[in-house]
Amino acid sequence: MMENFKHTTVLLDEAVNGLNIRPDGIYIDGTFGRGGHSRLILSQLGEEGRLLAIDRDPQAIAVAQTINDPRFSIIHGPFSALADYVAERELTGKIDGILLDLGVSSPQLDDAERGFSFMRDGPLDMRMDPTRGQSAAEWLQTAEEADIAWVLKTFGEERFAKRIAHAIVERNREQPMTRTKELAEVVAAATPVKDKFKHPATRTFQAVRIWVNSELEEIEQALKSSLSVLASGGRLSIISFHSLEDRIVKRFMREQSRGPQVPAGLPMTEAQLKKLGGRELRALGKLMPGEKEVAENPRARSSVLRIAERTNA
């Protein structure tokens, strides 16, 4: 059954404007979600334009399949494989723009059955594609305490990671957790100092979700693939929602905008320097939501949009 959860696309106009749409261009929306960005891109394309959308969430695919437009196609899979999708269509080096809206979507958070939120009781799942891989419950039941602590510290920046990991393992030993409410209660009980502005399970849920979905590895692979996929002058327009995501995007754009780094004083001929190649991208800056958007959609508060352009290198 199709859910009917509201989803407000964050930085909608800004992210699409960042692509610098050409009517006859070929674009990728790597995170279709509920189609906000895709529909706006399609509205700016001419008859010769094309849009390839990607999502690993079956519910997003169901929404995408309602779009009856010959310029549009949808792929069920991870955006980390975008280079493969493009190669299969013989479009490598011909893509004029890639848009990524990272992290979990509002419909995923709001649907208790998906298991993403500690605010709503549901199955402890957290998979963006429930047809593949381990659920959060399965992973927490089989993982070593030290591994759980590492995930909470690394992906949740949780200062009580060891204490929480121990509590999770002890609880699963007594009776395996299968519900989001159970995990939230265990984390809250194991957290000695409470933040009055944030639920104690916030960081744990973020960390487990990122781990279960390999989110940061997905981002790194997609960014790396973008260099071979984009045409000269093609744009990257990427929205991040937390510091771990934004750090990866920022570092990638900065490094690819600098070009190869040669140690000072190292003697190199012009031919050798040319062989190293020039910079791959030109960073065009970042944007953040305005006060009005944040007031209308509080989830936009932490979002950051970064834009870069493929060079001739």
From Swiss-Prot:
Q: Which reaction does it catalyse?
A: cytidine(1402) in 16S rRNA + S-adenosyl-L-methionine = N(4)-methylcytidine(1402) in 16S rRNA + S-adenosyl-L-homocysteine + H(+)
Give the similarity note.
Belongs to the methyltransferase superfamily. RsmH family.
What GO biological process terms are annotated to this protein in UniProt? Answer: rRNA base methylation
Record-given protein name? Ribosomal RNA small subunit methyltransferase H
Tell me the compartments it is located in. Cytoplasm
Biological role stated in the UniProt entry: Specifically methylates the N4 position of cytidine in position 1402 (C1402) of 16S rRNA.
Q: Which organism does this record belong to?
A: Salmonella typhi
Alphabetically ordered keywords of this record? Cytoplasm, Methyltransferase, rRNA processing, S-adenosyl-L-methionine, Transferase
The encoding gene is rsmH
GO CC terms in record:
cytoplasm
UniProt entry tagged with the keyword Translocase: no
Q: Which SUPFAM superfamilies match?
A: Putative methyltransferase TM0872, insert domain (SSF81799), S-adenosyl-L-methionine-dependent methyltransferases (SSF53335)
The residues the record assigns to binding S-adenosyl-L-methionine are 35-37, 55, 79, 101, 108
> What Pfam families does this protein's entry cite?
Methyltransf_5
Q: What is its main location?
A: cytoplasm
Q: What is its EC number?
A: 2.1.1.199
Q: Which NCBIfam families match?
A: 16S rRNA (cytosine(1402)-N(4))-methyltransferase RsmH (TIGR00006)
Enzyme class, spelled out: transferase
GO MF entries: rRNA (cytosine-N4-)-methyltransferase activity
Q: Cross-referenced InterPro entries, in alphabetical order? A: RsmH, SAM-dep_MeTrfase_MraW_recog, SAM-dependent_MTases_sf
